[in-house]
Amino acid sequence: MSYAQNNLGWMYRNGNGVAQDYTLAFFWYKQAALQGHSYAQDNLADLYKDGEGVAQNKTLAAFWYLKSAQQGNRHAQFQIAWDYNAGEGVDQDYKQAMYWYLKAAAQESVGAYVNIGYMYKHGQGVEKDYQAAFEWFTKAAECNDATAWYNLAIMYHYGEGRPVDLRQALDLYRKVQSSGTRDVSQEIRETEALL
C-alpha cells in the first residue's frame, strides 16, 4: 500500500498522468511515510524543505530525512548530512554531518565525496587533513564532478598538502570552465600569468 501511495505522491508532484498538485503530493507522501516507506519519507522531507504543498518547515524536513536515512536512503543520508553541516532544521553538528556523508559515500554519492573532502580540508568534524581531502576530491573528480575539479585545482594552485603544480591547476581550471558550472576565467588568467 505504501508503495502505491508514494507513487501517487510522485505523480502529483511531477504532474505525471495527473494535474500537478503539491497538496495532493504531500498528502500521499505523508500516508506512505507514516507507514515507514523510506522513499516517501525522503520525498516528504523535500516538500517540507521547499515549502511545496505545505508550509516550509526545515525542522520537519530534517526529521523525515533522518527517518529515511536511517533506513539506508542515500539521498536522505546526503540531505541530513547537509542539514547537520549547515545547521538547517537541526543544531549544527559537524561530526553528525561527517557520519551521514560517509554513509552516503558508501553508496557512491558523488556529492558526499566532495563534501567529505571539503570537511577534511577545513577540519570540520575531523582533524584537518589535506591528503584525505585530496583523496575524496579525486574520487569525485573521477566521476566528472566539476566542484571536485575546482577544489583539486585550488589544492594544486596553492600547494595545499602537495607541491604547487600550476600546470595541473590550470588543466583543472579549464575543465571547470568547459563544464559551464562556474566561471573560473579569473583563476585561469592568474594561473597562466604565473607560468
Predicted regions and their residues:
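TPR/TPR-like alpha-solenoid signature
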Residues: 6, 27, 42, 63, ...
